[in-house]
Structure formats: C-alpha cells, structure tokens
Amino acid sequence: FESCISFGSSFGGRLRVPGVARLAAGNKHEYLRPIRPGDEFHIYDKYMGFEEKETRGKAYRMFIESVPRYFINQRDEIAAIATGRNIYLATPPSKRERRDNKPYADKKRHHYGKEELDIIHQGYEEQLAGVGRRGAETRYWEDVVEGEAIRPVVKGPYDVCDACARTVVSCYTYAFAIKWAAMRKHLQHHPIDPETGEYRFRRDWHYEDHAARLFGVPYANVGGIHNEMMLVHGVTDWMGDDAFVKVMDSQDRRMNFLGDMTWVKGKVARKFVENGEHLVELEVWGENQDGVVHTKANFIVRLVSRAEYQSSF
C-alpha cells in the first residue's frame, strides 16, 4: 500500500562484494493506523544490519539483511513500517564450483490456448463487475472458518504494460541523468549492451528480454513488489471494507517472468483474539500457469466482531 508514498522500498541491498550473491527476500509490511486522503509523511530508514541463518550441508553462508522504513504522518504518528529484506549468499573461493548452466536455463515462455485465455478473460470480466469483492458487506470474525479458501484472483499473462504500471506506482522511475547517477559508481554491476556499447541499468531486466539475458536470465522478470501487490488483491476482496490489514509478511520463492500467469490463492490459517482485537491469519500465495509458487505471504487481518458490534448499541 505504502510503496506509492516513497521512492520504492527501503535502501538495503548496497553490499557489493565479489563472490557474494544478493537476492530479494521479500518484505514485511506493518500497518499501525489507517493512511487517509490528505495525509502527509516524512520517512526514514533504519539499517538493522545482517543476521546469519544456518545452512546445513551448503557450501555458502547465508545472511539476511533487514532495513525497516518508517512512515511518519503529519501528526507525528508512525502509520506504517515496511521492512525490506535481502538474502546474501557468501561462498568461499575454495568451495565455488563452475556454473555452466545459467539460472532458469530451461525456462520456456508458455503459449496460451483459447480455453486458457477464455478462463483468464472471464476472470477479468468478473473483477470488473465486482464479483468476489466483499465490499460493504461486513465479514464478521465469528463467521470465519479456519481452513476455508479465499476466492482465486487471476493476473496475467504479465507484460510490459503491467510492468510500467508497477514502476509508476512504486516511484521506480529512472531516466537519463538520474539513471546515470544511480549506476555510475558501480558500473561493474551493469553490463554493456553489445548492440549499443552503453551500460544497461539493472532495472531494465524487468522490461526487456534482451536486457534480462545480459543479466543472466532468459526473460524479463516481474518486480518483487508487484508480486506482493497481486497477493493483496485477493485479501482485500475477501475481507471487505470494514476490515484492516495489520501485517503482510512475504517471501520471494522464485522468479516470475513476463508471459507468466499469477493465480492468487489462499486460505484461513487461524482466527484468534489478541489485545482485544479479533484477528485472522491468512496464508496467501501466487502460482504460475504450471502451478509453481513464486511468492507467498502471511497476512494478519483485523475483522469486526459481531458480538462487540451489537453490544455497542
């Protein structure tokens, strides 16, 4: 939700050391109060450093980098905290193996048949008509059943238009001198395009297959924050207007490529009461046309209690 307020996500991911690979790990979003029209924010990041994770039987050491970003409104209240996370894999030179195969080397773009497209387009028609959107019909905590599924939401096949929409909303807009300023101090991480002789900015691998191949993957890939946004759609449709998302904690499991589908699916993991709030935990994931999960997240949603609502009158 808050990614449109500030410049993308928090500024971790700056460690660049030969032999140390960095991967996006997913983000945690905490919402302490509503963000309302007209609110103004000042924002700061708090660097939390690295935490080593145990990796038995692996040649590398794994570290998780965490950088929470705080959104402070005009009333000096913390409205939200978005914690960006990166995974670093550090392999000693003596244990590095030559890799002849590039990641996702066997990935082939799927060609969708008429039956598949009919299902996709029907899903979009239903979204436009509001089918499955809870809206003003209150979902009461007492009516929720653990284990019940949320209605699937269709997204895709993902294309450049979708990628550009994410770029604008997330404020990841780099061009000309601003783009050069972002990459000039570490050009060794930006490959030279053999067609033009110029360096290619890493963001380009989200839009163009040619650029993606320069970075070692076969196709342009979906930005992680957009995968998260897709999952949110399934949750907000399910919960209705009177509910409130308190926490979203996501994990990036694998790349999602242009041309891929995302089917947002989920279920109720548990319902509980904590600090007087009636809460539901949802397990939500996005899977592609092959049924492979690329992103997963746990949501904590506050619902209205029918008993408390009735007792207030």
Walk through the language-model features, giving the residues of each.
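Catalytic-pocket segment enriched in acidic/His residues
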Residues: 206, 218-222, 226-273, 287-289
